[in-house]
């Protein structure tokens, strides 16, 4: 287990360990799962080695949950409706209470973006395919959904708020 891969030296050691059959778990700072490929390449790792050392990519964010004690249905603002879609007219928002220390939030929920590195993705990585191509394949063939899509669904379900969605998917 590697705590965090921040530089080329750590990335190289991790890739060599993975190539020789060791399961290596590490973290990278990226906006989404597929961007990990670019990040490793930026650290000087050859595309062929990236393709053959990865088995999966996971992006994870924690979203604060609306407090179940003070959460109330409220009308969306025009800005929120632009973000959420015209079909959404109400959302759940905490008003603040003793259970949530006045924040309107209590607890967190994990949102994941998962990509399995299969034979086709290995080929794409090896030939230096654009991230958009790999992402499109993961969506179409693996059913991958982005952090933003999953977060949006949680807002629609009343689990969290548009502010939390913007916080975890600021780049989208």
Task: Walk through the language-model features, giving the residues of each.
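Short, flexible helix-loop junctions that flank or precede catalytic/ligand sites
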Residues: 1-172
